[in-house]
Amino acid sequence: MLAYHNDPTQKDAILAKLSAHRLADELVKGHYWENGKGCAVGCTIESGNHAEYEHRFGIPRILARLEDRIFEGPPNGSAKEWPEQFMGAIRPGADLSMVWPRFALWLLTEELPQFVKKKTTKAALSEVGALYREWCETAKNPEAHRWMKARKNASAAAAAAAAAAARGKAYQRFAAKLVELLEAA
């Protein structure tokens, strides 16, 4: 699959369309496409079907999902420029098949670890990161059973982290209630 099916006019057309949506203030967060307005994906394809990116633009759907998620995150001003930045960064004819694994590797090994405190969570990030590293180095997606094992371990780490966070919040509620009752006594 080649980006824009190796046709620069496809890129020019979508950039013009996205610019028109931005200038008309039709880029909005929270829904795909409704009444002539939508999110990054919605204004690009006038639907929420990320798979259309593959057929219409030669862009893997996982990148459309990532574009979508990133659009919803920042403040409105920079978010409205994001669809043009995203589509504008893609060279017609580019093979984008390794962009997702490279992004995921960066995210798991460079960006997220700085926010992780628990050893089990760090181990889960490392395990999944190792699979993405292998994918990036060999250009071959590791076998499904290896992803499933990593997913299971990551899910267990996430559940443990969520339980710990919930316990922490519960103790905060316990403390608040106790203070309330002490003050009322």
Residue ranges of model-derived segments:
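Short, glycine-biased loop/turn motifs at secondary-structure junctions and
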Residues: 1-156, 167-185
